[in-house]
A protein has these predicted regions:
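Acidic, Ser/Pro/Thr-rich low-complexity regulatory regions
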Residues: 10-177
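Short, low-complexity, charge-dense intrinsically disordered segments
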Residues: 1-9
């Protein structure tokens, strides 16, 4: 394998590992958010298996069919968390994990507007920092621009550039947090 291909493969593996770490943190918010995408638990269990983790509890968790009922999956998830020595996040950690999960998707250009809105969905429950408030204002500006209204929030942002502005702010938040 050429050195450049090896570096590219290593970089790709680091991204996959980072995505898995972010997904794991998101799953560990299970007890705090009733709007958690429970269906991701199956994906997470499959990723565990693909990463070499094997146990009856993980296989059971991976066998749920979507849509997954949160009450039905809870004992299976708790068994896996116990087996892996993972503990659920407290409220503050859960907030950061929730934000990180969706901003990671935004930073990867994955349904930027939808994932921004999903991240902000629980906005009123968060003790948020300035950057999250700025993202909320950008979301409002985006709504105004789509409706053909004047954007009073960010003068230099247009409908053509707002998505990139959101991506840059998401990347900044991820880097700093």
């Amino acid at each position: 394998m050429r050195p450049s291909a090896l570096v590219a493969k290593k970089t790709n593996m680091e991204l996959v590992n980072k995505d898995f770490e972010i997904l794991t943190d998101y799953i560990l918010t299970f007890h705090f958010y009733k709007y958690l995408n429970i269906d991701l638990i199956e994906n997470w269990a499959i990723e565990l298996i693909n990463s070499g983790y094997e146990s009856e509890a993980i296989y059971n968790l991976a066998c749920f069919y979507k849509p997954i009922d949160s009450h039905e999956v809870q004992p299976y998830l708790e068994a896996v968390l116990s087996e892996l020595n993972l503990t659920t996040k407290n409220k503050e950690e859960s907030q950061k994990s929730h934000i990180r999960y969706f901003l990671n998707k935004v930073a990867k250009h994955d349904d930027v507007r939808g994932n921004l809105k999903r991240m902000l969905h629980l906005y009123c429950d968060f003790d948020v920092d300035k950057d999250i408030i700025d993202l909320s204002v950008l979301d409002d500006a985006w709504d105004d621009l789509i409706a053909g209204q004047v954007n009073w929030y960010y003068k230099d942002v247009s409908l053509d550039t707002i998505e990139q502005e959101v991506i840059v702010m998401a990347q900044k938040w991820l880097y700093e947090n």
